[in-house]
Each structure stands twice: as structure tokens, then as C-alpha cells.
């Protein structure tokens, strides 16, 4: 397999070493160098699949000098692969600055897709999957965490976060304070022998985990704002009613905005009115 010089963003397993594509193995074997977060972790995966390519550290501590060196390797015609400790690179992992610099310089960039823990957790959670938002790692401090939750409380999408298991109970107590007793899912040890996903309302999950000592990282999923979803239905019904009374679009928008301004902007209401008016 002959690869074009450039950067290859290669997904790796999140737990089960067999969750790697044939293309990923071939790409890593035919690279001149593999950038990784931790050589000790990546070496185990490479050994499993008989990959002997040289490893080089690229992590959160890497700076512009490291990026310049990597760019010089690609400029010289080398094939460079980027992997993370687990899953898809750049998803709450280092790398986007390197990709941005290479993109600005018009160097070749390719992705070799594969598993990702947020998507794996979402598909197992039984929470709605049609709309979701991944917000990365939750901060350590309560105030910072509260700020993030407050920004997302009205979203209709399923929310996905990374968190540390040791902070889970405190996170859930705060989540209940901000979101109410919503349905959530806690996913851990994904694709491993002791994989576990627990779905229920926040009180149920707190009760389940309050006496269990957890380690490592978890994926926390919080269902979207059902009240907002209900208001969307109510908005559409309200507009349909107004149209049935032959009210003008301007009047309907003003009435709807006064009633639903805590959820929708005038622009969003205009869009719904326009859609309903011309599909009625």
C-alpha cells in the first residue's frame, strides 16, 4: 500500500483491540512515523497488530515547535499518522492545531474513521439519537460545571460529556439542580469485559452509584429539554390556529413571540410561520 505524503488521522480502539479497521492497520504499517499521546499505551496496540512504525509523542503539551517539526517531515515527503490513546483523534484530544496549520499550508490530510466513545455510548444509552451535542470533558470546579450546564439547559438535544468517575455523584447532584430529574445514562468500560451502561432518571442513577467506588473515565448523557420539545409542538399548533383565523403573518409573529420568547427568537418564529403558511 503506497500512501500519499501527508497527515493521516487514524481512529483506534476504545477498549477492545479488535475494534480497528483493516485500513487503519494498513495505514499505520505504511506510515513513516506515528504521532501518539503516550508511547506506552500505543505500543500495546501496535504490538497486537504487528505494527513496527516509529512512535513520536504529540499531546496536550506539544507546542508550535513540535508542529513545525511535523510539518517539515510532511514537506520532506513523509507519511505521518496521528492517533490518540483511544478512539478518534481530535475528539477531546490534541491535534486540531496541527490539522489547522496543515490545512492552511495546503498539505494533504486524510481521515481513517473508526470507533468513538461518545457515539458508542449514545447508541447504547436508549436516549434520543436524532439530535445530540458532545461537550467534551466537564471541568473540575462546581462553578465552571454549573456555567456549562446552565448554557445547555434549554437544548432539545441529548447532551454528551466526559467526566471522571470519582466526581460522578457530585456531577449528578449538580445536574439535578440545573436540569431537574431528567433521564440520563452513565456509560463506562465501553467495549471492555466489564462494560456497563445504566439509564434512568438522575435520582435512580445516584441511588445506584452512591455506594459504588468507580475508577477511570465515564461518558455521561443527559436527555434534552422535553419542555422545550413540547413548546415546539405548542408553537406550531398556535401558529396553525392563528392562520385558521386569517391573521396576518406580522400579527402572528408578534403574538407568537410574546408567548414563546423564552424559547424562540423572532427569526425562528418567522421561519415556522413562513413554512406553515405555504404548506397549509
Curated annotation (Swiss-Prot):
Compartments in which it is found: Cytoplasm
Pfam families according to UniProt: TP_methylase
Enzyme Commission code(s) on record: 2.1.1.198
Keywords: Cytoplasm, Methyltransferase, rRNA processing, S-adenosyl-L-methionine, Transferase
GO CC aspect terms: cytoplasm
Entry annotated with the keyword S-adenosyl-L-methionine: yes
Catalytically driven reaction(s): cytidine(1402) in 16S rRNA + S-adenosyl-L-methionine = 2'-O-methylcytidine(1402) in 16S rRNA + S-adenosyl-L-homocysteine + H(+)
Single GO molecular function: rRNA (cytosine-2'-O-)-methyltransferase activity
Keyword rRNA processing tagged: yes
Function: Catalyzes the 2'-O-methylation of the ribose of cytidine 1402 (C1402) in 16S rRNA.
Family that this chain belongs to: Belongs to the methyltransferase superfamily. RsmI family.
Protein name as catalogued: Ribosomal RNA small subunit methyltransferase I
Organism, as annotated: Rickettsia prowazekii (strain Madrid E)
